[in-house]
C-alpha cells in the first residue's frame, strides 16, 4: 500500500 510507496520514496531521497 502507501506504506510501500513511502518506503521507496525514502530510499530514493
UniProtKB/Swiss-Prot annotation:
Tissues in which the protein is found: Expressed by the skin glands.
Main location: secreted
Residues bearing PTM Leucine amide: 13
Compartment(s) of residence: Secreted
Keywords: Amidation, Amphibian defense peptide, Antibiotic, Antimicrobial, Secreted
Listed GO biological process terms: defense response to bacterium
Top-level lineage group: Eukaryota
Record-level GO cellular component terms: extracellular region
Function statement: Antimicrobial peptide.
Similarity comment text for this entry: Belongs to the frog skin active peptide (FSAP) family. Temporin subfamily.
This protein's name: Temporin-AVa
Protein species of origin: Rana arvalis (Moor frog)
Amino acid at each position: 500500500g502507501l506504506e510501500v510507496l513511502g518506503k521507496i520514496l525514502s530510499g530514493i531521497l
